[in-house]
């Protein structure tokens, strides 16, 4: 069983139960199918918007839910027990627009975009990575050149989550000759503008369905000056703040995948008989399942400690903690899902059983929001400062 963190409020627990029911009713029945078909489930995404999950970070004053990081992670975890891709759609518009506007937007930008986001029907993507700028994101080559009152954006972005279905995309581009991160700015770009081209949908190992990926190409895309979020050269700092917020959210998705895999492994071990008894009675498998549970609970404990600190405004050391929790949770997800496949044996390798999908999905949690090697570097840098 999964243990609910002791510091959850009554409101947190009620919300958790609501999302659990929603996930069992709406997500579980389609989770395998949207992976196999790589189909974007518009009908369920619309219900996410109705629940306020997509527009999670939009302030209440603009019609949004203004949800806490803790509740976002609760939603992510419960949804990921069945589907990682649908889990990530909770708070999907955060990185792409809501969080950048909260961190650095003008009042005019907030008034323009937040009411639209609050309806839960607009999808926004986050375009940072480039062919030559992955972990070294500050080396990006996409450029924005001033042309009167406008900017002209040219360049190429890769691995843009929700790119094929996005109405807007937050584009990070070099706007001046300052070295590396100091020369990067952020722009809100309407994907229907002339000069914006999407590449074909990427074919991925996992993480299929609700989170399609594609590349973007920008050819002298003209945007007004007020499309820039923050000041000239402040874009990289905005990107890093978004990623620090989202690392616990991705961690929650990882914990959810792991819990879902453990639940399936335990149920299978109780039911599957070999040598005249359920395989759950063999000590070797009992030890495996015990280790899986311990990894999940330790990851969950750190996760909600980190979210509680963020929600309380206790930001001292938060950057290192967000790196720690992302690494711990995603490594646990990879190990637990792999062990779940092993417990199911040949059945675990079959697509009719969900654990092989969960193992494929778990891998991306070690890569997104910064690879786990980068996270370890950030933790070490904090220790040695």
How does the language model describe each region?
Residues 120-128:
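A short, Trp-centered hydrophobic/proline-enriched beta-strand micro-motif
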Residues 154-199:
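A short core secondary-structure module
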Residues 139, 194-222:
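Flexible, small-/acidic-enriched active-site or ligand-binding loops
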Residues 99-104, 178:
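Flexible, glycine-rich active-site loops centered on histidine and acidic residues
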């Amino acid at each position: 069983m999964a243990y609910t963190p002791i510091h959850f409020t009554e409101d947190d627990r009620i919300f958790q139960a609501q999302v659990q029911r929603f996930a069992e009713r709406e997500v579980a029945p389609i989770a395998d199918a949207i992976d196999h078909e790589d189909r974007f489930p518009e009908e369920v995404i619309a219900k996410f918007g109705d629940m306020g999950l997509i527009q999670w970070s939009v302030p209440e004053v603009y019609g949004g839910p203004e949800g806490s990081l803790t509740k976002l992670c609760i939603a992510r975890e419960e949804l990921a027990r069945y589907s990682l891709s649908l889990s990530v759609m909770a708070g999907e518009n955060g990185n792409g627009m809501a969080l950048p506007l909260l961190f650095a937007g003008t009042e005019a930008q907030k008034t323009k975009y937040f009411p639209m986001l609050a309806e839960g029907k607009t999808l926004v993507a986050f375009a940072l990575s480039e062919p030559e700028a992955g972990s070294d994101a500050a080396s990006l080559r996409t450029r924005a050149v001033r042309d009167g009152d406008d900017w002209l954006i040219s360049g190429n972005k890769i691995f843009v989550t929700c790119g094929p279905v996005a109405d807007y995309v937050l584009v990070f581009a070099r706007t001046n000759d300052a070295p590396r991160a100091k020369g990067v700015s952020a722009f809100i770009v309407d994907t229907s503008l002339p000069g914006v081209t999407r590449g074909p949908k990427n074919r991925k190992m996992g993480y299929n369905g609700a989170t399609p990926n594609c590349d973007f190409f920008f050819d002298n895309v003209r945007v007004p000056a007020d499309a820039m979020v923050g000041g000239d050269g402040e874009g990289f700092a905005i990107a890093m703040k978004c990623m620090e917020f989202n690392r616990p959210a991705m961690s929650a998705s990882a914990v959810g995948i792991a819990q879902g895999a453990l639940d399936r492994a335990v149920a299978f071990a109780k039911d599957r008989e070999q040598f005249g008894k359920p395989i759950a009675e063999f000590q070797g498998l009992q030890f495996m399942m015990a280790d899986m549970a311990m990894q999940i609970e330790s990851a969950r404990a750190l996760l909600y400690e980190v979210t509680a600190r963020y929600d309380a405004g206790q930001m001292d050391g938060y950057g290192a903690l967000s790196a720690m929790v992302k690494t711990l949770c995603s490594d646990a997800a990879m190990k637990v899902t792999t062990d779940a496949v092993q417990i199911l044996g040949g059945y675990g390798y079959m697509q009719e059983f969900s654990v092989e999908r969960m193992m494929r999905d778990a891998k991306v949690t070690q890569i997104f929001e910064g690879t786990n090697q980068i996270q370890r570097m950030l933790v070490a840098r904090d220790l040695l400062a």
